[in-house]
């Protein structure tokens, strides 16, 4: 099955100065349009800012802390989550992720805060753009959405589109592709996370960072308010990335260590293990013909039988708080885990080179123990089992100064920047 988002990435990577000039010309023209939208709002008698988060996957959502602040300021903000379908990976994935996403946000915020962007029974996509003043797009790829849920459609309406990363930018080629596509050059405001990402956006983006604000990584604000469960046993988080077959960003080593995972509970009976794969890992393995659905189901059955906790979607900061260490080959998890101050093992794909990853990812990996083989992973776990690691559990000065910008108040910074009625 063709992955439309991956095709968009590959298309954007191609050298195409004529297309880039067209995007720049349109982006430059949007400045006056956005100012007109703001002026119209200020001239209106409506003193509420109507805000929507367009979300297709609950695990790819970077606005929770901001949304929570809005919920507490009902005198200024009327906020909703609009569930939109991911149409890029086939109907079963579209249906299942939509249902799961809707259920998650209804439970998380309450059903009154959730709006449907898809009538599943009638199979009709619902245009709600004109109901809002500002729309946050959790997904930076229009190829994953239908037209009425896209950024390129939003800029033709009386609305201000904004973007916040749902994860740290770690893949250089994927970041480059987003910088050369229309979506993030067209948004009114693009809130970014670190000085590294800010500088790379200014260097790579077609409009050279004209719409970018360095605000910090709002997603991690929530971590400061999480209290883990009291426990008597050590717990290790295993996080596997989805890039099993992706030359643009060869992070995943899942095919190297997937059998090892199943054997860990017997090897280390005094440690609990949690398996938290990227939400796209198994769907991509199926679509790329790496595994069949039956093979995926069989593996997950073995995970359960081995006594490994399977974490599938939703928030994960409680896991960060509860776990004593992480084994991962992921992207943003690599940087997010640094907020905990706890030990980590990064499983390094031998195909990964500096040209594949962003500066902040390169710097983040340096803070990890590196595993090249299954034996290296086992050695790391032995150290955790034997208490051969620091117990400080707090971020160091480098993380605070370079990665955790405005932590734990990045959400307040973003909220202030979006308040067009000030």
Which functions belong to the PLM regions below?
Residues 82-86, 93-105, 265-312:
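Catalytic donor nucleotide-activated moiety binding site of glycosyltransferases and closely related
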Residues 294, 342-387:
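Nucleotide-sugar donor-binding patch of glycosyltransferase catalytic domains
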Residues 52-222:
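Active-site and donor-binding regions of nucleotide-sugar-utilizing enzymes
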Residues 19-39, 165, 174, 178-256:
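A nucleotide-sugar donor-handling region in carbohydrate enzymes
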Residues 62-63, 72, 218-297, 403-412:
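Conserved catalytic-core segment of nucleotide-activated headgroup transferases in glycan assembly
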Residues 1-3, 374-422:
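C-terminal amphipathic helix plus adjacent low-complexity
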Residues 162, 312-356:
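A donor-sugar binding/catalytic signature common to diverse glycosyltransferases
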Residues 1-56, 72, 422:
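Non-catalytic N-terminal targeting/anchoring module and adjacent flexible stem/linker
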